[in-house]
Swiss-Prot record:
NCBIfam families: small_GTP. A lipid is attached at C205, C207 (S-geranylgeranyl cysteine). This is Ras-related protein Rab-7a. It is an enzyme of class 3 (hydrolase). One of its GO terms (biological process) is epidermal growth factor catabolic process. Its EC number is 3.6.5.2.
């Protein structure tokens, strides 16, 4: 049996302050929910080992402050991400409207090799609340328009769809990590035209 090197998947969670990013992360990693969370200052992360298609991987899940005054986390925070999770509150339409800005912010800062196909996952959180303002079809339509991003409706408080959502996040992140590894091991070959080949042969001739 061949031993595989340990895989670390970096997952970034973005969204406005108060949408439940920290709650989702804690529900998934620690199976806990609390109403006493303080606003995340800067960035924080939790790790969890999970099985993805018979492969053990470590997910490093990064939580960010949603307030604009903390939005200067910089390139180092985003770089190396394997998946980006965009979270909004289904009871707060403004948090849905800012998904475009968060997605653009990530693509600018992270500069992924293939931005068109970089894996995003969208979570519409707080479905346990009654005063819903963002319809499922509206959220699905936005995701479809952005290269068909996977969409889950979640409740961090009631643990609804949290496990399923993060399974998809882990699987998509692993796929991204594998593609990056393949690209790094087998970069695009340098093509020589006939003149270059002839010149190279002539220079290497010692006669």
């Amino acid at each position: 049996m061949t031993s595989r090197k340990k895989v670390l998947l970096k997952v970034i969670i973005l969204g406005d302050s108060g949408v439940g990013k920290t709650s989702l992360m804690n529900q998934y990693v620690n199976k806990k929910f609390s109403n006493q969370y303080k606003a995340t200052i800067g960035a924080d992360f939790l790790t969890k080992e999970v099985m993805v298609d018979d492969r053990l991987v470590t997910m490093q899940i990064w939580d960010t402050a949603g307030q604009e005054r903390f939005q200067s986390l910089g390139v180092a925070f985003y770089r190396g991400a394997d998946c980006c999770v965009l979270v909004f509150d289904v009871t707060a339409p403004n948090t849905f409207k800012t998904l475009d800005s968060w997605r653009d912010e990530f693509l600018i800062q992270a500069s992924p090799r293939d931005p068109e196909n970089f894996p995003f996952v969208v979570l519409g959180n707080k479905i346990d609340l009654e005063n819903r303002q963002v319809a499922t079809k509206r959220a699905q339509a936005w995701c479809y328009s952005k290269n068909n991003i996977p969409y889950f409706e979640t409740s961090a408080k009631e643990a609804i769809n949290v496990e399923q959502a993060f399974q998809t996040i882990a699987r998509n992140a692993l796929k991204q990590e594998t593609e990056v590894e393949l690209y790094n091991e087998f970069p695009e070959p340098i093509k020589l035209d006939k003149n270059d080949r002839a010149k190279t042969s002539a220079e290497s001739c010692s006669c």
